[in-house]
């Protein structure tokens, strides 16, 4: 399968536009009549909207919901259910066949990682976020190898609040550890973020007010009691 590294290496003396890298990679798939299988980490349904609309034109996608950073548990369950429901609705509306896979919810591992690295007091966007991105990219890469996918990647680059340059650099580093290719991206480019807002309205998708991290949420003054109450009320619609 085609590796993005040769494309990126030609841009080393400039700020890398990972949206262009992805489109060049897709061009190579098309020239070689390749339709790869991609295991795509998604942090939430909103970030997967435009991302799926774009990628399903060229590849077979499975959404991998691996987000043990989300707190509290009911909020995690709400976001997972919203993600699963969007995949079902997207498939029904478009005729796509996107799969939904949910990783184990293991928040103790995330908290331990943060405390072991002494990152609890980091500001959002700092080293704690870097460690969180790396942890989740590692999880999805490992799963991609186990399940035979050609690429692993993340929909999180759609968010204008997240550092796509950093996420892609981490993804390329993780790629070196596992026998699977990283899918570079910057999905917010080419009006991807604007399209995601339209799709959230079209599909009536819940948009959360914080990333999910308990440490960042406490810094922001998030009211966990209210979050938990609202999430619990939502989940009561799905008794199974």
From Swiss-Prot:
A single BP term in Gene Ontology: tRNA modification
First-level EC class: oxidoreductase
Signal sequence range: none
Intrachain disulfide bonds: 211-213
UniProt KW keywords: 4Fe-4S, Disulfide bond, Iron, Iron-sulfur, Metal-binding, Oxidoreductase, Queuosine biosynthesis, Redox-active center, tRNA processing
Pathway annotation: tRNA modification; tRNA-queuosine biosynthesis
Domain of life: Bacteria
Binding residues for [4Fe-4S] cluster: 43-44, 129, 132
GO MF annotations in UniProt: 4 iron, 4 sulfur cluster binding; epoxyqueuosine reductase activity; metal ion binding
Catalyzed chemical reaction(s): epoxyqueuosine(34) in tRNA + AH2 = queuosine(34) in tRNA + A + H2O
The EC number(s) this enzyme carries: 1.17.99.6
A Pfam family annotated for this UniProt entry: QueH
Family per record: Belongs to the QueH family.
Main function: Catalyzes the conversion of epoxyqueuosine (oQ) to queuosine (Q), which is a hypermodified base found in the wobble positions of tRNA(Asp), tRNA(Asn), tRNA(His) and tRNA(Tyr).
Protein name: Epoxyqueuosine reductase QueH
Organism name: Staphylococcus aureus (strain Mu50 / ATCC 700699)
Underlying gene: queH
